[in-house]
Amino acid sequence: MALAFFPRGGSAQVARYLARFLPRSGWEASIACGSLGPPGAESNAASFYAGLDVHALDYTRAASAPDPLTAEPPFQPSFEDRAGAPDRVFAAVDDTVYERLVATWETQLADAGAGSADLLHLHHLTPIHEAAQRAFPGVPRIGHLHGTELLMLEAIDAGAPRGWDHAQAWAERLRRWARGCERLLVLSPDAVRRVPGRLGVEPERIVLAPNGFDPGRFDRRPLTGALRLEHWRRWLVEDPRGWDESGVPGSVAYSERDLAPFEGGGPVLVYVGRYTDVKRIPLLIRAHARARERFTSRTPLVLLGGFPGEWEGEHPLAVVRETGDADVFLAGWRGHGELAAGLNAADVLVLPSVREQFGAVLVEAMACGLPVIAVDAHGPAEIVDDGQTGWLVAPDDEDAMGEALVAAAAGDGAERSRRGEAAYAAARARYSWPALAAGLARVYEDVAAGRPPREGAGTLAHGA
């Protein structure tokens, strides 16, 4: 199993959980990946994938080099275009650097034992595919799309932005790599419909592979009353991780007086994720600020996440200052092992992202018994049953988001509880990692045995 990136986003979580649960179905997985930072950091591969067989490419020195892509080893490019970030967008990477990336990953795959593997499970569409094709042409490949590669490809097809000087070469590569995979795993029914036309692959090679949750970690363990207040005191006052425009964790901290919104017994709303443009955090903050006067009790909004120093567009703290909304809190980046505690100290998860290809945090929140508010598009539209497990709103509609916040916070909580119960049942019926890993093992067996894909898209949940 290989992915070019250091642990940061959802694809790393997927790789970690699959590698942990696949042995139950007879498959052992080694992980070749990127790494950043010292041992103990969440972005350090050995720490993040602790207990697994990990072969990591250390990007730490490259990240601070004058040109990270000419360092040794070269830093990872990105499917996202963020000004000033060390990981420049793939579409701006020239052929010389591309060849260096391929050569680097040929060596890394060899060190991880790719030559003796039954198959290669490659996350995203990156130069790892080219490295695998050149160095190990006889080992079958499974591609795993996580959505960001599709967003970059769609942007190229719509007319590449300025600075994407090598966009067409990368578009051709992504399509060629996809066509070279025996199967392509995608996150949602929406992707099942979009991918064949976008990448030029046969529909029968597509396998629906939703993200999941660990049932041993994510469950209903609600913190209420004094225990809830103590949790937020610890995360916001005693051990703050929020960060301002400096990017330094702890540069946003709160006092005991600031915790007043948590003391009245009103519901707590929580956002979990990165501070990227598609997440629409500024819209959420403004919707919350406008809804405050309509809440029947103080209803704090906690922003949990934001990889330190990484943001696009308006910084969330700047929007908080602009709106004067003292009930919005920046809790900063926490490890995935702490996420269940944060969810259980809240009442509703809110995800305003307009281009979310899946939305794993929705499933994790539902597995903790939380109803969710999300946008009626892409992955969330497939996960959330509007009116039953949560609320769906139109993309980029601040008014609709505000109405959903008011509805979720209203009354005595009976409606939240009803939808939370339905969310809990739905998550456990459809998105358990052990069951999804067992389904993936069946796909592995078909590919390793050279069986052709079956007619129509497969799915991990019901055998592929």
Where are the predicted features?
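A conserved catalytic-core segment of Leloir-type glycosyltransferases
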Residues: 30-115
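Membrane-proximal helix-turn-helix segments that form the acceptor-binding/catalytic region
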Residues: 110, 164-184
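Conserved donor-binding/catalytic core segment of Leloir-type glycosyltransferases
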Residues: 185, 226-279, 285-288, 302
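Carbohydrate-associated surface elements
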Residues: 190, 212
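Nucleotide-activated donor-binding/catalytic signature segment of Leloir-type glycosyltransferases, i.e.
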Residues: 305, 313-337
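Aromatic "clamp/platform" in nucleotide-sugar-dependent glycosyltransferases that forms part
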Residues: 354
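Short hydrophobic beta-strand element within catalytic cores of glycosyltransferases
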Residues: 371-374
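Conserved acidic donor-binding segment of nucleotide-sugar-dependent glycosyltransferases
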Residues: 386-387, 391-398, 407-413
